[in-house]
């Protein structure tokens, strides 16, 4: 099916929002211009809505295989499509871990069979993410590994991390890191700050993250490796990354929507839906994340979509697992709380969710260019809705944003020229 989207707006190559039509033919973007006509295409009048590149998320958890009670590739990618994401990068904390040929081939077969959007799987740095034996990077790359990470487990052994970075550099691949120094975690469940003190909870200090990033940056410099930092959350981490970039070290970084919108002062009670890792930090940390995003220290926004069951989250803040679901709320949360409040522009938000992650990792995604694969999301910037987890397509309903009123909701997502998801009656 060919589609002609009429009367839309998009961000052009100069970074300006302008009026446009867009023609999709044979799965590709055939033309982006005003006043397009086509005889062999279904015409869809988007009536002034935003035509954006499909969103790109380099940090997601799909849970399959091994955690299908939390999420599946099918439900997770449907939720991604509903959130406007067309390319997502799946973390390897599955069971089994994609750490060898057999496990990666199985994962890729599942993705091919079940995914509604483009899914790029990470390969693990170490076997079973155990930190003691390096995986076969060459084989994992051959089988389509996006990059290498041990995800929710920081690689504690510096010699292992250095060896991994050297091998990744030879393959022109990135090493991606969840940064925690295990000896400083302190069995914490929230940030070490006012909230932990008030509620008598063990806290995770900010330096637990930043000291690990500092170590890895020096290792990356020694290995001449592209090193990407997951979900930056502290002022100290931003400072260390900024200094590294000024020194010419190949470091990039991401921040989550929840760390841009919330800080520890916003946690109303010991509610496990506010428990994520890294935890919500202090006001100064929150301000540093915004500053880092605006000055280029932080390169992109990634959701860290981490679904859990209601039963798991009901165990209380100390025992419940870390993480919140993120696909279906990311764009409206950011548009409402950053763009509408004048903190960043719409153009910047689009870049942080599309071309910045795509360019950082060399993906042919993130831009509406003629000849490229038609990965597109249509967004209604005017429609206001309340966040209601009962409407989520994700199995995970674990969100701290219940009842938040937001604008900027995706209404249609196109992947490879085919409609992957459409809001009922939105464009008829």
Curated annotation (Swiss-Prot):
Binds 2 Zn(2+) ions per subunit. It is an enzyme of class 3 (hydrolase). Pfam families: Amidohydro_1. GO terms for molecular function: allantoinase activity; dihydroorotase activity; zinc ion binding. CDD domains: DHOase_IIa. Its cofactor is Zn(2+). Zn(2+) 1 binds at residues 59, 61, 151, 304. GO terms for biological process: 'de novo' UMP biosynthetic process; purine nucleobase catabolic process. Its EC number is 3.5.2.3. The active site is at residue 304. Substrate binds at residues 61-63, 93, 277, 308, 322-323. The keyword Metal-binding applies. Signal peptide: none annotated. Keywords: Hydrolase, Metal-binding, Pyrimidine biosynthesis, Zinc. It catalyses: (S)-dihydroorotate + H2O = N-carbamoyl-L-aspartate + H(+). Pathway: Pyrimidine metabolism; UMP biosynthesis via de novo pathway; (S)-dihydroorotate from bicarbonate: step 3/3. Zn(2+) 2 binds at residues 151, 178, 231. The keyword Protein transport does not apply. HAMAP family: PyrC_classI_B. Belongs to the metallo-dependent hydrolases superfamily. DHOase family. Class I DHOase subfamily. This is Dihydroorotase. The gene is pyrC.
């Amino acid at each position: 099916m060919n589609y002609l989207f009429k009367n839309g707006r998009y961000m052009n190559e100069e970074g300006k929002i302008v009026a446009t039509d867009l023609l999709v033919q044979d799965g590709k973007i055939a033309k982006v211009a005003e006043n397009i006509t086509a005889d062999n295409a279904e015409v869809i009048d988007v009536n002034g809505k935003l035509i954006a590149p499909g969103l790109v998320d380099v940090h997601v958890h799909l849970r399959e295989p091994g955690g299908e009670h939390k999420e599946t590739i099918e439900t997770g990618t449907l939720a991604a499509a509903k959130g406007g994401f067309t390319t997502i990068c799946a973390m390897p904390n599955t069971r089994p871990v994609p750490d060898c040929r057999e496990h990666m081939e199985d994962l890729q077969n599942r993705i091919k069979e079940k995914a509604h959007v483009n899914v790029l799987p990470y390969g693990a740095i170490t076997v079973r993410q155990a930190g003691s034996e390096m995986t076969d990077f060459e084989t994992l790359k051959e089988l389509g590994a996006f990059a290498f990470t041990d995800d929710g487990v920081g690689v504690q052994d510096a010699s292992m991390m250095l060896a991994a970075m050297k091998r990744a550099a030879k393959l022109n691949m990135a090493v991606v890191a969840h940064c925690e120094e295990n000896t400083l975690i302190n069995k914490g469940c929230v940030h070490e700050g006012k909230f932990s003190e008030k509620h008598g909870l063990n806290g995770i200090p900010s330096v637990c993250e930043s000291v690990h990033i500092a170590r890895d940056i020096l290792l990356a410099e020694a290995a001449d490796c592209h090193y990407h930092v997951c979900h930056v959350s502290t002022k100290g981490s931003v400072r260390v990354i900024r200094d590294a970039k000024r020194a010419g070290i190949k470091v990039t970084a991401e921040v989550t929507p929840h760390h841009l919108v919330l800080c520890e002062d916003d946690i109303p009670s010991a509610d496990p839906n506010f428990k994520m890792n890294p935890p919500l930090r202090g006001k100064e940390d929150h301000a540093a994340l915004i500053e880092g995003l605006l000055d280029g220290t932080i390169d992109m926004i990634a959701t860290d979509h981490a679904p859990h069951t209601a039963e798991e989250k009901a165990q209380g803040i100390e025992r419940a697992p870390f993480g919140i679901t993120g696909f279906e709320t990311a764009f409206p949360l950011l548009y409402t709380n950053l763009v509408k409040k004048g903190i960043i522009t719409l153009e910047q938000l689009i870049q942080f969710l599309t071309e910045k992650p795509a360019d950082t990792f060399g993906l042919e995604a993130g831009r509406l260019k003629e000849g490229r694969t038609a990965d597109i999301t249509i967004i209604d910037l005017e429609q206001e809705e309340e966040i209601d987890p009962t409407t989520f397509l994700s199995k995970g309903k674990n969100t701290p944003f219940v009842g938040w009123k937001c604008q900027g909701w995706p209404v249609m997502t196109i992947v490879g020229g085919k409609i992957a998801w459409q809001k009922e009656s939105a464009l008829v």
